[in-house]
From Swiss-Prot:
This is Large ribosomal subunit protein uL23. Gene3D superfamilies: 3.30.70.330. InterPro entries: Nucleotide-bd_a/b_plait_sf, Ribosomal_uL23-like, Ribosomal_uL23/eL15/eS24_sf. Belongs to the universal ribosomal protein uL23 family. Pfam families: Ribosomal_L23 (PF00276). GO terms for biological process: translation. It comes from Aliivibrio fischeri (strain ATCC 700601 / ES114) (Vibrio fischeri).
Length: 100
């Protein structure tokens, strides 16, 4: 079993974008930003424990950080790992349920 401290560090937060919203409405899928070294098993365990829902599957991808310039200095944004978490039928996770 994965320890509780690690599970809290795996999920960084929900990813809110047009594509993520469309996935949530149509496919019962929630998109999270996760730790770059998190595994699919850790992500599944963290979502099931923290939100008390059943997860069907997890797909992950890493987006490379953009190169940015400020004057003569050049830097690079950090890479971000995203997790598309597909919930089982009948399960629901609503982050903005109380907002009106």
């Amino acid at each position: 079993m994965i320890n509780e401290e690690r599970l809290l560090k795996v999920l960084r937060g929900p990813l809110i974008s047009e594509k993520a919203t469309m996935a949530a409405e149509g496919n019962n899928t929630i998109v999270f930003k996760v730790a770059i070294n998190a595994t699919k098993k850790e992500i599944k365990a963290a979502v099931e424990k923290l939100f008390e829902v059943e997860v069907k599957s997890v797909n992950t991808l890493i987006t490379k950080g953009k190169t940015k310039r400020q004057g003569l200095r050049q830097g690079r944004r950090s890479d971000v790992k995203k997790a598309y978490v597909i919930l089982k039928e009948g399960q629901d996770l609503d982050f903005v349920g109380g907002a009106e």
